[in-house]
């Protein structure tokens, strides 16, 4: 089993020292979904939700979430993020919205947590904007689907492992 780097020899949590690591280009992609009724999805697609442009606001919230990751997760390093993209795609087969967040940096540590935070923040924002219409929405499937750059190399989630 891999050694957990966020704990010292005494088992105490600490922020990992990355000062000796090389600066490399890094990318992470995370995705999730939010399920809802077809009637609620219609509000999204027709732009008739009471709070406004659900997907546009959720996209911005996801971007903001990535930028605030180090403020939310105690042992994350503040990073010079060079790109955040959040894609929200209505999917009638769920029914709901599929969310993908891509984050890039050129730095000494990866951006997986920023991508996960972006995707989850976008999903939470969709919920917030639609909760007056439906309280039974379900957020799920949050995962890293791609991570590249740095010492550990490339990781891609197996195809077909998403709902």
Curated annotation (Swiss-Prot):
Keywords: Lyase, Molybdenum cofactor biosynthesis
Catalytic-site annotation from UniProt: 128
GO molecular function: cyclic pyranopterin monophosphate synthase activity
KW S-adenosyl-L-methionine (keyword) present: no
Single GO biological process annotation from the record: Mo-molybdopterin cofactor biosynthetic process
InterPro entries recorded: MoaC, MoaC_bact/euk, MoaC_sf, MoCo_biosynth_MoaA/MoaC, Mopterin_CF_biosynth-C_dom
Signal sequence segment: none
Complex formation: Homohexamer; trimer of dimers.
Name of the protein in its database record: Cyclic pyranopterin monophosphate synthase
């Amino acid at each position: 089993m891999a050694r957990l780097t966020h704990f010292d020899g005494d088992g105490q949590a600490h922020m990992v020292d990355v000062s000796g690591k090389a600066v490399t280009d890094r990318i992470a992609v995370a995705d999730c979904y939010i399920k809802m009724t077809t009637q609620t999805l219609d509000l999204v697609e027709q732009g008739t939700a009471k709070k406004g442009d659900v997907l546009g606001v959720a996209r911005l919230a996801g971007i903001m979430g990535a930028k605030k990751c180090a403020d939310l997760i105690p042992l994350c390093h503040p990073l010079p993020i060079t790109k955040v993209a959040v894609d929200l795609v209505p999917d009638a087969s769920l029914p709901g919205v599929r969310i993908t967040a891509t984050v890039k940096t050129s730095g000494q540590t990866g951006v997986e947590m920023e991508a996960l935070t972006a995707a989850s923040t976008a999903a939470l924002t969709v919920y917030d904007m639609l909760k007056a219409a439906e309280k039974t929405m379900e957020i799920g499937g949050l995962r890293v689907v791609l991570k590249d750059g740095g010492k550990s190399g490339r990781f891609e989630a197996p195809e077909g492992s998403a709902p």
